[in-house]
C-alpha cells in the first residue's frame, strides 16, 4: 500500500510518483510505501495552506480552543493506536511510544489554554503620551520538519501552538 499525503482534509497523490519503503526496524519487513513530494507538490500544499489560513485567521479564539480540545481528546482516545504505529515504524517499545505521546500532549494541553494569553492588552500612558496596544495578528503559513525518531512528540510540540494562535 502507498501512503499518500493528506492535504486539506483529503488524500493527495504527489505528482512525483516517487516512494520510499516503510520498514519495520525489528524485522526489516517492508510494510508500506511512503509517497514523496517534490517542489511542485510543496508549492501546491503551501498554496492550499495559504488559502485555508485566511479563514482560520478569522476563526474566533473560542472556536480554535474547542478544536484543540477535540484534538486533545482524539489523541487520548487513540494513543494506543498511535503508539502501535510508532512501535511498528520506529522500533520503540510500547512504553517509550506512550511516553512520547504523553510528552507531546503536554504542549497540546498548553495550547488548549493559550486563549488567556491571546486576548491582547492595552496599557494607558506606558510613557508620557504613549499608549501600548498588544494585538493578535496571524503571521501566515508555517511548516515543521520533524525528526524520524520522534514522529508524534515533535509534531505535537509545533503544530498545536501554531494552530491555536
Predicted segments — roles?
Residues 1-130:
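N-terminal Rossmann-like NAD(P)+-binding subdomain of aldehyde/semialdehyde dehydrogenases
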Residues 121-165:
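Conserved small-residue-rich beta-alpha loop and adjacent elements
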Amino acid at each position: 500500500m502507498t501512503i499518500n499525503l493528506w492535504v486539506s482534509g483529503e488524500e493527495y497523490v504527489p505528482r512525483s510518483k516517487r516512494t520510499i519503503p516503510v520498514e519495520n526496524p525489528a524485522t526489516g519487513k517492508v510494510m508500506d510505501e511512503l509517497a514523496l513530494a517534490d517542489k511542485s507538490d510543496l508549492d501546491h500544499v503551501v498554496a492550499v495552506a495559504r488559502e485555508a489560513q485566511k479563514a482560520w485567521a478569522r476563526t474566533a479564539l473560542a472556536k480554535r480552543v474547542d478544536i484543540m480540545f477535540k484534538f486533545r481528546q482524539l489523541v487520548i482516545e487513540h494513543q494506543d493506536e498511535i503508539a502501535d504505529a510508532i512501535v511498528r515504524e520506529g522500533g520503540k517499545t510500547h512504553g517509550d511510544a506512550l511516553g512520547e505521546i504523553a510528552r507531546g500532549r503536554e504542549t497540546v494541553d498548553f495550547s488548549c489554554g493559550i486563549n488567556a494569553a491571546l486576548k491582547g492588552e492595552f496599557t494607558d500612558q506606558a510613557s508620557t503620551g504613549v499608549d501600548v496596544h498588544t494585538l493578535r495578528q496571524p503571521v501566515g503559513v508555517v511548516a515543521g520538519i520533524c525528526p524520524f525518531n520522534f514522529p508524534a512528540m515533535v509534531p505535537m510540540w509545533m503544530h498545536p501552538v501554531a494552530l491555536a494562535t
